[in-house]
Amino acid sequence: MGLKEDFEEHAEKVKKLTASPSNEDLLILYGLYKQATVGPVTTSRPGMFSMKERAKWDAWKAVEGKSTDEAMSDYITKVKQLLEAEASSASA
């Protein structure tokens, strides 16, 4: 399986987590996903009254400079960590 297919598979797996990841983890995933699928952020930073959009923009901007492959690989790693954490908490 290629990196792109593995990335797409993990993008689907994250939707099936039974426990919602923390906001921090969601923002990390968002930034990596956008960097992997769109590339560098090209829009201006949202205003301070759009806190949710601003946080998402900041998460995307934080991974600026990563290649598509790096972003995909980091995304896969993060999803695997979340899946492992969920599995260990379910068996505890």
Swiss-Prot record:
What Gene3D superfamilies is this protein classified in? 1.20.80.10
Q: Sorted alphabetically, which keywords does the UniProt record give?
A: Lipid-binding, Transport
| UniProt keyword Glycoprotein, yes or no | no
Domain spans labelled ACB: 3-88
Q: Which PROSITE patterns match?
A: ACB_1, ACB_2
Entry's Pfam families? ACBP
Similarity annotation: Belongs to the ACBP family.
Return the protein name.
Acyl-CoA-binding protein
